């Protein structure tokens, strides 16, 4: 390794050291930093230098080949969170990658016990399941591959049998539980117990979303393109589709009591007989006001955010700007257009200008 590479690696290790110093080993969200692209390749740093708690480091040491999947799972979760909420008042803002030790990746929302916390934990757990399962199906790991329970049998009467490579989502879910879930009994404070129980439930809700959207794919076999026999296998849905399901769960999330007796129950007394389903997203505290800046909580507010003047949805100026109104300014765009290939051998284009109205919240 040359001198420049060694210097870069030492600087990266120093950044991770800052993260570990500010956030102790018990913190659940540290691993999420692995999804930030500018942090480099965690495999080169080694398990001991990564922002993981003691249990995760031990698992990392025993299964170092899973590091690329862990990093990809974090990246998937972060990307989908930002995509699903890009037009909302809370837009899943992450901390600056240039200052990795100044705050948790998702800031206040990671520990606030709100609906936003619920979505973060669910989508990150789902991302880990998705990436590990994909890696298994691709043959990148020795201890998992395709789902062996779906390699024989089928329905001869319906003319199909199991074949191909079914995604082994059960292994992905097992690893996600092993890597992310921590026993509640190790926590003493009542408030911490409630939040930890909530986070564990939402982790599982994220995993259930991946399992629920498993689909059946089939390929036909027969003479002259007929479908006399079909070979079928189960595959995971795109992570975007999983993100849409979790966003719907977020919109219909259930508020629970901040007191745990034998089990969690709904906050509203008249609804406590309604059972909590394992795929529900749960939250304890109401969300703060995301309309205005709150430096203490790290909430930037919506001032200066671009909005859609004609939309009635969350991205519309009326909702996104919280009734404060909006400013309009004209943006001039210059681009190449009407390009033609000239023989021989170059491309000639015109410069085209266009004007666009851009609306931003006051």
Swiss-Prot record:
GO MF: cytokine activity; frizzled binding
Glycan-bearing residues: 140, 186, 308
Matching Gene3D superfamilies: 3.30.2460.20
KW Methyltransferase (keyword) present: no
Coiled coil: none
PTM per Swiss-Prot/TrEMBL: Palmitoleoylation is required for efficient binding to frizzled receptors. Depalmitoleoylation leads to Wnt signaling pathway inhibition.
Bridged cysteine pairs (disulfide): 81-92, 136-144, 146-165, 218-232, 220-227, 291-322, 307-317, 321-361, 337-352, 339-349, 344-345
One annotated Gene Ontology cellular component of this protein: extracellular space
Superkingdom classification of source: Eukaryota
Signal peptide: 1-29
GO biological process, one term: neuron differentiation
Major subcellular site: secreted
Annotated compartments: Secreted, Extracellular space, Extracellular matrix
A Pfam family matched in the record: wnt
Record-linked SMART domains: WNT1
Lipidated residues (O-palmitoleoyl serine): 224
Keywords: Developmental protein, Disulfide bond, Extracellular matrix, Glycoprotein, Lipoprotein, Secreted, Signal, Wnt signaling pathway
Primary role: Ligand for members of the frizzled family of seven transmembrane receptors. Probable developmental protein. May be a signaling molecule which affects the development of discrete regions of tissues. Is likely to signal over only few cell diameters.
Family affiliation: Belongs to the Wnt family.
Name the record gives this protein: Protein Wnt-16
Protein's organism: Bos taurus (Bovine)
């Amino acid at each position: 390794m040359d001198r420049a590479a060694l210097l870069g690696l030492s600087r990266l290790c120093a950044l991770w050291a800052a993260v570990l110093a500010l956030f102790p080993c018990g913190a659940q969200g540290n691993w999420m930093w692995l999804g930030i692209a500018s942090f480099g390749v965690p495999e080169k740093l080694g398990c001991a230098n990564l922002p993981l708690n003691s249990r995760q480091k031990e698992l990392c040491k025993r299964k170092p080949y899973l590091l690329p999947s862990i990093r990809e799972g974090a990246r998937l979760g972060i990307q989908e969170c930002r995509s699903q909420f890009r037009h909302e008042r809370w837009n899943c803002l992450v901390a600056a990658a240039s200052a990795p030790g100044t705050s948790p990746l998702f800031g206040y929302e990671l520990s606030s016990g709100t609906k936003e916390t619920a979505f973060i934990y669910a989508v990150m757990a789902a991302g880990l399941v998705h990436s590990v399962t994909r890696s298994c199906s691709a043959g990148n790991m020795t201890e998992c591959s395709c789902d062996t329970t779906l390699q024989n049998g089928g329905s001869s009467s319906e003319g199909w049998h199991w074949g191909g490579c079914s995604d082994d989502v059960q292994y992905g879910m097992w690893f996600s539980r092993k890597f992310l879930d921590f026993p509640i009994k190790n926590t003493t404070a009542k408030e911490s117990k409630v939040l930890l129980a909530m986070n564990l439930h939402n982790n599982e809700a994220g995993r259930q979303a991946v399992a629920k959207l498993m689909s059946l794919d089939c390929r036909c076999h027969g003479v002259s393109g007929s479908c006399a026999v079909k070979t079928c296998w189960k595959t995971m849905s795109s992570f975007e589709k999983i993100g849409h399901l979790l966003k719907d769960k977020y919109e219909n999330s259930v508020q629970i009591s901040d007191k745990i007796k034998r089990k969690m129950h709904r906050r509203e007394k008249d609804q406590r007989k309604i059972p909590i389903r394992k795929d529900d997203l749960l939250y304890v505290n109401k969300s703060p006001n995301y309309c205005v800046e709150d430096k203490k909580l790290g909430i930037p507010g919506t001032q200066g955010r671009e909005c859609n003047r004609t939309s009635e949805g969350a991205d519309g100026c009326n909702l996104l700007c919280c009734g404060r109104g909006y400013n309009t300014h004209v943006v001039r765009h210059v681009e190449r257009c009407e390009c033609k290939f000239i023989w021989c051998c170059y491309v000639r284009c015109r410069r085209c200008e266009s004007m666009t109205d851009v609306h931003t919240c006051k």
